[in-house]
């Protein structure tokens, strides 16, 4: 039997097959690209509060599920599964890409929009219940639609990202600390299984041969990654927002530093603008601004329109700390001192800088009635049960009972206290490891 071959039909059939193949290839390619950049799945995230100390890797590893027959007390944890390694690499790649892209949301024209006299930077870890309260307070703040809010994260969380995705009342930018425990679960700056246990004496550590045996802190303890991370994040964030955030390249205003468990009064921006004007006109020697102290009077009468000039103290004025670019540049010149001082608290370390490295003691302009409150009565320094709803209810009650005194028409400096010498604070330790020192100092060199 003879078959007649029609060249035209063969050509058409070939083109059809090629077209189908191209469509299939393109679809798979897009899928692979989307999978590569997509956020990690919810079930890959650890339970909140799963922290660990020292070399107890299984409790701090993010995205790695503990196998049932693996003991958390093992001196050398099991080798991570390849899927876990791939997940960690996806986190790192995603963080790098987002920090590079710096996608600005809630602005009409991203290429032409510029921030005004205030930018907020919020340090976020993994307490969505408190972050939700902060966002609620921001939503109620008058004039917030003109304020850029930068959220700086050290933990990738779908729940937290969804909370921030719901912010539609102000410009928003998210950045991510690229050296978090989550991104380095099995190695420094996370907890390396070869690290020395926290309470191991130095002579025993030297015999054991753990990798940081030479570098205990001032109290003989070895580093705990979960405590070191906060100071790292704060210093990286300080540098990154001033030097690497493109929208702030020519910014001449102030940056107000917050944390996820802070709560702002509805008139905080109103008061802040008046404080900034007062500083320029009546207190040019003031180095920094603060939105308030931890002590709040039950009545705002006679004080809501008053501010004081004082010597800055880390235990009183670390909430709502606002810096100019000039103040930042003086701080960054003290990088070596900040990064080697043996205290895991960023604010106590700043206090040490004011007496050891900065040209003079910091002078702070602060309102007599706080416009910022600490909702987080639990956390790193507290062992209380977290009750964010109780705390927010108390703050709301205080504000509602004094709303007639808020939004003052003018602010006046009630008193300029004499700037007194402050003794160097007693260091708390937790920052003796030379690896922490060198990583901290490297942030200035990062592009």
Curated annotation (Swiss-Prot):
Topological domain ranges for the Cytoplasmic compartment: 1-9
Pathway: Protein modification; protein glycosylation
MF term (GO), any: alpha-1,6-mannosylglycoprotein 2-beta-N-acetylglucosaminyltransferase activity
EC number(s) stated in the UniProt entry for this protein: 2.4.1.143
Outcome recorded upon mutating residue 290 to F: In CDG2A; strongly reduced protein levels; loss of enzyme activity
Catalysis: reaction(s): an N(4)-{beta-D-GlcNAc-(1->2)-alpha-D-Man-(1->3)-[alpha-D-Man-(1->6)]-beta-D-Man-(1->4)-beta-D-GlcNAc-(1->4)-beta-D-GlcNAc}-L-asparaginyl-[protein] + UDP-N-acetyl-alpha-D-glucosamine = N(4)-{beta-D-GlcNAc-(1->2)-alpha-D-Man-(1->3)-[beta-D-GlcNAc-(1->2)-alpha-D-Man-(1->6)]-beta-D-Man-(1->4)-beta-D-GlcNAc-(1->4)-beta-D-GlcNAc}-L-asparaginyl-[protein] + UDP + H(+)
Gene that encodes the chain: MGAT2
Source organism: Homo sapiens (Human)
GO biological process: oligosaccharide biosynthetic process; protein N-linked glycosylation; protein N-linked glycosylation via asparagine; viral protein processing
Enzyme class: transferase
Keyword flag Metal-binding: yes
Residues noted as binding substrate in the record, renumbered to the chain: 123-127, 154, 229-233, 298
Primary residence: Golgi
Protein name: Alpha-1,6-mannosyl-glycoprotein 2-beta-N-acetylglucosaminyltransferase
Entry binding sites for Mn(2+): 261, 374
Positions of glycan attachment: 69, 86
